[in-house]
């Protein structure tokens, strides 16, 4: 399991790069490649002038996550997405809703997406993602 850069096995350098790739995959997953408003999600329409980028400890993002997560905690996630960053209690309620309810609270929340992004970054950098995904 060596990269094209010569890192083999579980060396410190290999662990560093796989950690960085994991971070990149997480950021890509949470920002949706900067597509914060998906107009095809008509059940969770975007409010005019609102931005649905990553906020809070779980980095909730995109209108299709803010709507259900807001409903799960009794907040208008679509109409006031900034509240996640402005209100500490709602911030952590949102995180708990994701941790406890996952896919039930927020359809589309998928570890498979993050794994897919991780594999894409590994491929682009010539690094073996390893067998434990």
Swiss-Prot record:
Key words of the record: Alpha-amylase inhibitor, Carbohydrate metabolism, Chitin degradation, Chitin-binding, Glycosidase, Hydrolase, Polysaccharide degradation
Protein name per Swiss-Prot or TrEMBL: Alpha-amylase inhibitor/endochitinase
Record has ATP-binding as a keyword: no
Enzyme Commission code(s) on record: 3.2.1.14
Residues at the catalytic site: 30
UniProt function note: This protein functions both as an alpha-amylase inhibitor and as a chitinase.
Catalytic activity annotation: Random endo-hydrolysis of N-acetyl-beta-D-glucosaminide (1->4)-beta-linkages in chitin and chitodextrins
UniProt cross-references to InterPro entries, sorted A to Z: Glyco_hydro_19_cat (IPR000726), Lysozyme-like_dom_sf (IPR023346)
One Pfam short name: Glyco_hydro_19
Similarity section: Belongs to the glycosyl hydrolase 19 family. Chitinase class I subfamily.
Organism, as annotated: Coix lacryma-jobi (Job's tears)
GO terms under biological process: cell wall macromolecule catabolic process; chitin catabolic process; polysaccharide catabolic process
GO molecular function, one term: endochitinase activity
